[in-house]
């Protein structure tokens, strides 16, 4: 094992233990670092700021988005900061490299009508359809992340109180309320889930809340496909995914007057600044309503 491989492995283990990041995030870190060192052609101890700047410039010339380039630079900063704090290197070369300035895009979200159509789309009494309905209702009702939904266990659900216990980023737990429609969908799903277990004599792991036909915990990819499938079914042309439903949940709450700090808690954001992006969405919505409704906003006829 080379020094580079040794350092990358140690860094990834450190991230996993300290932050509890998902396997998807860890793979992204690994890919970013391997790509950088393939470019740098030197061991971590010999990396200088000019090498990092050269890598960033190459990424931009390749046509990578500013968001992607900023993420790669963030990975390098975290990596070299770790090596410096552990005494593996004497100077942190990433510390003096300027950030990539990116314009923060407003999150996409569904209209109220489309959100209602989406959660009503699954209507058959089949296991997969009732499961899909419960998933869509829960997304719109709670705003949880796809990784949080896939990680839910039966014991995390309290239908009597209308609450779920969610494990978010860094394995931080929070309690999130569940709406009446989502509760009803979950009850139907749990009943048909039990029938499936008996009917197919599946050797189910009793823990996962959402499972596939084989009784295994549902994956992120499967959930993304479910959301995309029903979005197409109701005629939404833009590509949407689970995160769109998270944005929809937050945006609709704000439009109805919910306090920003309450939304922050529900979403599991560590910082209020992350949640504040939705105030821009709400402002855009208010301007659109004004333009359509206020007499003085209309051109002379």
From Swiss-Prot:
Gene3D superfamilies: 1.10.150.130, Intergrase catalytic core (1.10.443.10). Coiled coil: none annotated. Keywords: Cell cycle, Cell division, Chromosome partition, Cytoplasm, DNA integration, DNA recombination, DNA-binding. Residues 105-291 form the Tyr recombinase domain. Its main location: cytoplasm. The active site is at residues 145, 169, 243, 246, 269, 278. It holds the Pfam family Phage_int_SAM_1. GO terms for biological process: cell division; chromosome segregation; DNA recombination; DNA transposition. InterPro entries: CB, DNA_brk_join_enz, Integrase-like_cat_sf, Integrase_catalytic, Integrase_recombinase_N, Integrase_SAM-like_N, Recomb_XerC, Tyrosine_recombinase_XerC/XerD. GO terms for molecular function: DNA binding; site-specific recombinase activity; tyrosine-based site-specific recombinase activity. Belongs to the 'phage' integrase family. XerC subfamily. The keyword Cell division applies. Forms a cyclic heterotetrameric complex composed of two molecules of XerC and two molecules of XerD. It is found in: Cytoplasm. Residues 2-84 form the Core-binding (CB) domain. Site-specific tyrosine recombinase, which acts by catalyzing the cutting and rejoining of the recombining DNA molecules. The XerC-XerD complex is essential to convert dimers of the bacterial chromosome into monomers to permit their segregation at cell division. It also contributes to the segregational stability of plasmids. CDD domains: INT_XerDC_C. This is Tyrosine recombinase XerC. One of its GO terms (cellular component) is cytoplasm.
């Amino acid at each position: 094992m080379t020094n580079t491989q040794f350092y990358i492995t140690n860094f990834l283990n450190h991230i996993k233990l300290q932050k509890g990041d998902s396997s998807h995030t860890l793979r992204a870190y690994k890919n970013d670092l391997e790509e950088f060192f393939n470019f740098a052609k030197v061991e971590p101890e010999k990396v200088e700021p000019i090498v990092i700047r050269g890598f960033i410039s190459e990424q931009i010339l390749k046509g990578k988005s500013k968001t992607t380039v900023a993420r790669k630079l963030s990975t390098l900063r975290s990596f070299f900061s770790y090596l410096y704090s552990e005494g593996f290197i004497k100077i942190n070369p990433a510390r003096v490299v300027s950030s990539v300035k990116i314009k923060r895009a407003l999150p996409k979200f569904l209209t109220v009508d489309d959100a209602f159509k989406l959660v009503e789309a699954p209507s058959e009494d089949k296991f997969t359809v009732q499961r899909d309905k419960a998933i869509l209702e829960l997304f719109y009702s709670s705003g949880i992340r796809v990784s949080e939904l896939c990680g839910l266990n039966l014991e995390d659900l309290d239908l009597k109180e209308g609450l779920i216990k969610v494990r978010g980023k860094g394995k931080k737990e929070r309690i999130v309320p569940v709406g009446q429609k989502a509760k009803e969908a979950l009850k139907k799903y749990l009943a048909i889930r039990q029938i499936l277990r008996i009917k197919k004599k599946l050797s189910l792991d009793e823990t996962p809340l959402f499972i596939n036909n084989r009784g295994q915990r549902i994956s992120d990819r499967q959930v993304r496909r479910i959301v995309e499938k029903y979005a197409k079914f109701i005629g939404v042309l833009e590509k949407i995914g689970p995160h769109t439903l998270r944005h929809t949940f937050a945006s609709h709450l704000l439009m109805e007057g919910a306090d920003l700090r309450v939304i922050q808690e529900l979403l599991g954001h560590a910082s209020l600044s992350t949640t504040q992006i939705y105030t821009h969405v709400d402002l855009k919505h208010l301007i659109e309503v004004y333009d359509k409704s206020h007499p003085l906003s209309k051109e002379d006829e």
